[in-house]
Amino acid sequence: METLWTLLYLLEPAPATLIVTAVTVTFASAFRALNYGKEMERNRDFSEASITLDSSQALMIPVMSSCSLLLMFYLFSSVSQLLTAFTAIASVSSLFYWLSPYAVYMKTQLGLSDPFLSRCCSKSFTRIQGLLLVACAMTVVAWLISGHWVLNNLLGISICIAFVSHVRLPNIKICAMLLVCLFVYDIFWVFFSERFFGANVMVAVATQQASNPVHTVANSLNLPGLQLITKKLELPVKIVFPRNLLGGVVPGVSASDFMMLGLGDMAIPAMLLALVLCFDHRKTRDVVNIFDLKSSKGHKYIWYALPGYAIGLVAALAAGVLTHSPQPALLYLVPSTLGPVIFMSWRRKDLAELWEGPALSNPIEKSHEIEI
């Protein structure tokens, strides 16, 4: 009975909001990836084509991630300002990518004229795109000044969506290879890294705050309003919510005051969801409309992967609440997402096609290896 009462904490605003946000972002990332791939295919524009991982690249991701973890564990204070600057640039680009379709939709709905403004880096920019780019840059500047958790989450979500659109999995075989390797990676760095490095490397890196280069520059130039600029920043590599979401918790006081979920725990499952969403669309050839996904949902693998993600996420949070210790989310998310997809595709005799991926008959597509 005591355990049940403990688990009721998951119904509190912070964990409930985290769960809803993560599930929504994961699905939105997969759906955006599908539309992006179709847009590139329709326009025959492969200059911004996504990267399709092969087996060697999939195996290298956990290795490179481990090296990055150790680098940030030992040298974070030395490279934090550089990381912040790089993250700020990536955030502007990701935010622009995420919001561009909405800007186009609003322009169409309002019947606005949108003349070309200029050309930059072989790309034509319209007036609305220019305004959107300025708005994205101002959002990142606001984050650099305030460090507010809402802006941190906004930038993190945009990075997740952009990553899933531009880094693709060609088939379930490569997907399973990647997920299993990251499954082991997550378990090792959360549960066993303390035995080798004297501290929980994953937790230490996840809770570190970066030095703010804007504060450093303002301080060196003795600019007015220095007290308004936050000295430390949470990098948008995770989404965070105050544990007392409705209680007026001051952002950035302590990492322990926040619930957090790494972007990888959304982006990696979203890559699987993007793969099965593309497979569903290829099999049914439905119109790419988010509301049309409800039709014939019993024939779509996305409706096994997405609930599986939600169940795995709830299980991870429940384990954390019961054990009062950090949990490797992929320990729960990998079986709960990959398992149902493989089992149902085996039952429906689609596993062979999913396992190897679609045959590319178009030579242009083959040369560019465009997969959604």
UniProtKB/Swiss-Prot annotation:
Pfam families: Peptidase_A22B (PF04258). A motif (PAL) lies at residues 328-330. It is an enzyme of class 3 (hydrolase). Its EC number is 3.4.23.-. It is a multi-pass membrane protein. One of its GO terms (molecular function) is aspartic endopeptidase activity, intramembrane cleaving. Belongs to the peptidase A22B family. This is Signal peptide peptidase-like 1. It comes from Arabidopsis thaliana.
